[in-house]
UniProtKB/Swiss-Prot annotation:
Its cofactor is Zn(2+). Is required not only for elongation of protein synthesis but also for the initiation of all mRNA translation through initiator tRNA(fMet) aminoacylation. The gene is metG. It comes from Pyrobaculum arsenaticum (strain DSM 13514 / JCM 11321 / PZ6). One of its GO terms (molecular function) is metal ion binding. Pfam families: Anticodon_3, tRNA-synt_1g. InterPro entries: Anticodon_Met, Met-tRNA_ligase_1, Met-tRNA_synth, Methionyl/Leucyl_tRNA_Synth, MetRS_core, MetRS_Zn, Rossmann-like_a/b/a_fold, tRNAsynth_Ia_anticodon-bd. CDD domains: Anticodon_Ia_Met, MetRS_core. This is Methionine--tRNA ligase. GO terms for biological process: methionyl-tRNA aminoacylation. It is found in: Cytoplasm. SUPFAM superfamilies: Anticodon-binding domain of a subclass of class I aminoacyl-tRNA synthetases, Methionyl-tRNA synthetase (MetRS), Zn-domain, Nucleotidylyl transferase. It comes from the Archaea. Its EC number is 6.1.1.10. A motif ('KMSKS' region) lies at residues 333-337.
Length: 570
């Protein structure tokens, strides 16, 4: 049994996540964490709301509300939505917690004492109209690399490059749109140049990093590491702990990535085992796995490892950062301003949670950008989830219920075809296990579905309803192995569709908990089945039209309200 820290990217809570955010980080991390638990590993799965920084502050200024109140309201809503999506966090916290603030300040004080932080006077944008400095998302302009017109002062969301405001072409204030002036102010910098060789060694020598994360990180390293300012002049954030830094806050991305550690500290503190976090983060045998969209790669693959190195503590380096490509909606990027896409609160009003979870993992953008379309969703729900998986389970269990008195049949005397079938199922399960281990979640679920497809072919070929008329023992042998294959199917699908897997397990009447190893064990003959009912139902094109009409009605209600926390559908 191994120890794992699993973390999903911390969402900004100026709004709720959309489907792309979910599959890029939170849902993928949940699937992996659930899989690890099924295998019997010790897992701490954490994340939290990114409460600080310019997105919240800009929005709060525009709405005339206190950023702390705004962020806390949105945090509570997002946490509830994740619960409804069956995200199995051990702790979902936020960056304004006492534990996180204390941890961050003490951490950066050590980095400062170790000599990795220096000061420099810089010209920074200032808005004379709003009388505020314009760090990060307070200033927008054209990206010098890709030409994107609304690049932010810290990063271009189009090409993913890290930026500073001086690189922007035609910068403007994000609050009022006016042209900024430049003023001199002092900031504290992390000297990444001194850590560059160690970071390069970490990236180049990491066999677990996905290709997009490794290529993006090596490209940045090839350009050379520049010192990065870790303080800001905005008020909403964690006060910087450095001498002379009064009135400065820690740049949100530098403090948010430390949340993966502070959340584990907080988790064990809540359990009354305050020192146990060290058993995870200070043990080199622990595996640390992050799940992020590709725009978050630099902060997880370069910045966080650099901070851990600069701390001088014996922190375990992240094992991998599982990064996806982008999920599009009907061929285009998600856009809140254009209301293009589906947000996770809306999704829950349209289809059951397991349907969303299955479709998103089934089309997960692991190697290239992928588009969610309603046509694809229809095909996956109807042909894969209902016809392949649900139909197979129903065929096996209904036959046992109606023809065998609802009891698991004896194993009988298997034919070569029977032995070949259950052997193939075991091989598919092992293949799915390898995909889960490699965090190839899309391939894992596709492989598990093959168990159901093989099962349907097996039933058609062996026809136990005909065998039962002339050779009861042969029919028993078929149904016993078909039933056994459902154990494999339930376990393989459990990380993705936990509710449906538990329902299937209950219908099978199995009293032992659903685990990966339990699936491999032969069923107990004579065990009574539970209530058998269809696992899924089909969705028609007319259903989709009705759902989309309903979505427009829901949005009319949402956007008639003023405040973001009032616009969420609960």
């Amino acid at each position: 049994m191994a120890k794992y820290v699993v973390g999903s990217a911390w969402p900004y809570v100026q709004t709720v996540p959309h489907l792309g955010n979910m599959i890029g980080s939170v849902l993928s991390a949940d699937v992996y964490a659930r899989y690890l638990r099924l295998r019997g590993h010790e897992v701490v799965f954490v994340s939290g709301s990114d409460m600080h920084g310019t997105p919240i502050e800009v929005e709060a200024i525009q709405l005339g509300v206190d950023p702390a109140d705004y962020a806390l309201k949105m945090h509570q809503i997002v946490a509830e939505l994740f619960r409804r999506w069956d995200i199995s966090f051990d702790l979902y916290t936020h960056t304004h917690s006492e534990t996180h603030i204390k941890f961050v300040q003490e951490f950066f004080a050590r980095v400062y004492e170790n000599g990795f932080i220096f000061t420099r006077d810089d010209e920074v944008p200032y808005c004379p109209r709003d009388k505020i400095y314009l760090p990060d998302r307070f200033v927008i302009g054209k990206c010098p690399y890709c030409g994107y017109e609304r690049a932010r002062g810290d990063q271009c969301e189009n090409c993913g490059r890290l930026l500073d405001p001086k690189q922007l072409i035609e910068p403007r204030c994000a609050v009022c749109g006016s042209k900024p002036e430049w003023r001199v102010t002092r900031h504290w910098y992390l000297d990444l140049r001194r850590l560059e060789d160690r970071i390069r060694k970490y990236v180049e020598g990491n066999p677990h990093l996905p290709l997009n994360a490794k290529e993006m990180s090596l490209a940045m390293l090839k350009e050379g590491m520049r010192p990065r300012a870790i303080t800001r002049d905005n008020k909403w954030g964690i006060p910087a702990p450095f001498p002379g830094a009064e009135g400065k806050t820690i740049y949100v991305w530098f403090e948010a990535v430390l949340g993966y550690i502070s959340a584990v500290v907080e988790y064990f503190k809540k359990l009354g085992r305050e020192e146990e976090w060290k058993r995870f983060w200070l043990d080199q045998e622990t595996k640390v796995v992050f799940f992020v969209g590709k725009d978050n790669v630099p902060f997880h693959v370069i910045i966080l490892p650099a901070l851990l190195m600069a701390s001088g503590e014996n922190y375990v380096m992240p094992t991998t950062t599982a990064s996806t490509e982008y999920l599009l909606y009907e061929g285009d990027k998600f856009s809140k301003s254009r209301r293009w896409g589906i947000w996770i609160d809306e999704a829950l009003h349209l289809l059951p949670t397991d349907y969303w979870r299955f479709v998103l993992v089934y089309i997960r953008p692991e190697n290239r950008d992928t588009s969610f379309t309603w046509q694809t969703a229809l095909e996956v729900i109807n042909k894969v989830l209902n016809d392949d998986v649900g139909n197979y389970a129903n065929r096996v269990l209904s036959f046992i219920k109606s023809r065998m008195g609802g009891a698991v049949p004896p194993p009988g005397k298997p034919s070569p075809e029977d032995e070949e079938f259950i052997s193939k199922v075991a091989q598919l399960f092992q293949k799915a296990e390898a995909h889960y281990d490699a965090i190839e979640l899309k391939e894992a679920v596709h492989t598990v579905v093959e168990i159901a497809r093989e099962g349907n072919k097996y039933l058609n070929a062996r026809a136990p309803w005909e065998l039962a008329k002339k050779d009861a023992e042969a029919a028993n042998a078929v149904l016993y192995r078909a039933f056994w294959s459902l154990k494999y199917l339930a376990a393989g699908l459990a990380p993705v569709v936990p509710r449906s897997a538990e329902t299937l397990w209950a219908m099978m009447g199995i009293s032992t908990p659903l685990t990966w190893e339990e699936a491999k064990k032969p069923p107990t003959p004579g065990a009574q089945l539970g209530e058998v009912k269809p696992l899924f139902r089909k969705i028609t094109e007319q259903d989709v039209k009705v759902l989309l009409a309903k979505l427009e009605e829901l949005r009319a209600q949402k956007y008639s309200r003023k405040y973001p926390w009032e616009q969420v559908l609960l």
